Amino acid sequence: MITTAAPDFAAALPNGGRLAGLDVGTKTIGVALCDAGWSFASPDKTIVRKRFSADLDALKALVAGQAVVGLVVGLPLNMDGSDSPRTQSTRAFARNLAPLGLPVLLWDERWSTAAVERAMIAADVSRAKRAERIDSAAAAFILQGAIDAMTR
């Protein structure tokens, strides 16, 4: 099941269990995880993309190792809310996650990377460290937005 509605996604999830947030780029996939009570999201890691089968294997290992029950995938919309070419590729990526057998929430990721980068600059994180952590931190920002919407 793939949806853009947080209530539908929440209804498809078992009670409890961790969620994973994904910030899908052309070169990397930023990964974040939340606690089983859906209170807070934390950056986890960045997967360097190769081919989709390798990406799927890495995500299968994550799902199994972290007991993930649902995925929140950042959806890159244009500023006016319309689809962009990246939106279509992200929707295709989400459809290709079907072998994982998990519900998928496509969540608006507008401003996520910019907000995270501003926070890192304000915290005086070096440019090298920002580059290392930006994708997983953006995934945490996306995931936190989704869990906040589900637990209101």
From Swiss-Prot:
GO terms for cellular component: cytosol. It is found in: Cytoplasm. Its main location: cytoplasm. The keyword Hydrolase applies. Keywords: Cytoplasm, Hydrolase, Nuclease, Ribosome biogenesis. It comes from the Bacteria. Its EC number is 3.1.-.-. The keyword Signal does not apply. Could be a nuclease involved in processing of the 5'-end of pre-16S rRNA. Belongs to the YqgF nuclease family. HAMAP family: Nuclease_YqgF. NCBIfam families: RNAse_H_YqgF. This is Putative pre-16S rRNA nuclease. The lineage of its organism: Bacteria, Pseudomonadati, Pseudomonadota, Alphaproteobacteria, Sphingomonadales.
